[in-house]
């Protein structure tokens, strides 16, 4: 562990000590919009500490929204959390992890089981979170990748939109792209796995290695929201959202900037989609 990693860990510990106690109190008193302000401030500060520079384009939807993004790393949570007042959807085993599980509970993460038999309970938990006024961030790939491409999206991630009361909930595709790492944006020495956490990598060593580096620059593109009709094909919807996400990736140059996108606040009615049932 080098000096940079030590300093970053110390700064992160101080950040947790500064923000976690008041957030714990807020959640005991009120779980409304005010309880979502500190997590966003926490993620912004954590990005600075970790050397994560976020380059955003487009604009997140207003109101209740399900943001569907590709997934490269556990660090994606800090990146997206610095831009969104939203709760993340995560596998339930994270809830039991030391420290990390506690921190994710403080930001009102929705924990879900991967057991197919728990599908109804998962849908109910997501509906409950949205009904409380929260927006959600989910990773429909169901795992992380190195970010060169986007894995197939699981159609089960979108069954929620067939439930009653979802008509006014936005669905917005989001592209996460690694633009630079350790001061390099392409070519020799571009170590994608310094940021990307996938395969058989271990969380602790991967995080320490990143903390000892010069950090990374990550692009986030908010695509136009998709209007989901009442009668829709779940697999077609998953494919459409994935195509939107893929369209935000640079085809060959890992250092290429994301194409510019409108900066105005997005509307759920901005992009009707042809995803009717087949």
What does each model-found stretch correspond to?
Residues 1-55, 102-106:
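A transmembrane-helix-recognition feature enriched in membrane-embedded lipid enzymes
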Residues 19-32, 48-49, 64-116:
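Catalytic core of membrane glycerolipid acyltransferases/transacylases, capturing the structured
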Residues 29-32, 94, 143-146, 227-228:
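Short histidine/acidic/glycine/proline-rich micro-motifs that form metal-
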Residues 58-60, 125-131:
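Short amphipathic alpha-helix with an adjacent loop that forms part of the alpha/beta core around
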Residues 64-69, 134-140, 169:
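Generic beta-sheet signal
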Residues 100-101, 115, 148-232, 240, ...:
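A cross-family acyltransferase "interaction/gating" segment
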Residues 126, 134-136, 140-153:
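Soluble extracytoplasmic domains of inner/organellar membrane proteins
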Residues 235, 240-278:
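Cytosolic-facing loops and C-terminal tails of multi-pass membrane proteins
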